[in-house]
Regions:
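Conserved catalytic core of sirtuin-type NAD+-dependent deacylases
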Residues: 1-168
Length: 168
């Protein structure tokens, strides 16, 4: 551990990459754990694709309301706050995460790149009008009639190119 700490302190540019372990420590389910992962209990093709959004709308909405409520019920843990302190004292320069819970930003980090998007914002799939996450819990229909969805990458969608450019 001491060797790692020395490397961290001596490095010129440190980027932290986080994934599901950070979210599970906050109490959120991961996707692929054999006994408790989301995809053990739910079929991703029925719930986490653009096709599901358009052809299985009610189940799509209920699934993402369930996930959003889980995020609201949880929150950043000590590890998130430690990374915030490291950013403040310039031990790390940024965080790249696969997580969509937004906990790094809630903990105070400012230089966060969310590869798969975030539950912190939602938008209409048809007209792209932005919505607050709390609005989605009560109403998933946009003023244009389209379906409101989380600002996350669904199965079959590409990762946003600007995320890679910024991350580099």
């Amino acid at each position: 551990m001491k060797a790692f700490a020395n490397l961290l302190l001596e490095a010129n540019h440190v980027v932290v990459f986080t994934g599901a372990g950070m979210s599970t420590e906050s109490g959120l389910d991961d996707f692929r754990t054999k006994t408790s992962g989301l995809w053990e209990r739910f079929n991703p093709q029925e719930l986490a694709t653009v096709d599901a959004l358009t052809h299985n709308r009610e189940q799509f909405i209920q699934f993402y309301r369930y996930r959003l409520q889980a995020v609201f019920d949880a929150g950043p843990h000590e590890g998130h706050h430690i990374l915030n302190e490291w950013e403040k004292n310039k031990t790390i320069q940024s965080i790249i995460t696969q997580n969509v819970d937004g906990f790094h930003s809630l903990a105070g980090n400012r230089k966060v790149r969310e590869l798969h998007g975030s539950f912190s914002t939602f938008y209409c799939h048809d007209c792209q009008a932005p919505y607050e996450a709390t609005y989605f819990l009560e109403n998933a229909q946009c003023h244009c009639g389209g379906t409101i969805r989380p600002s996350i990458v669904l199965f079959g969608e590409g990762l946003p190119q600007n995320t890679f450019q910024i991350a580099e």
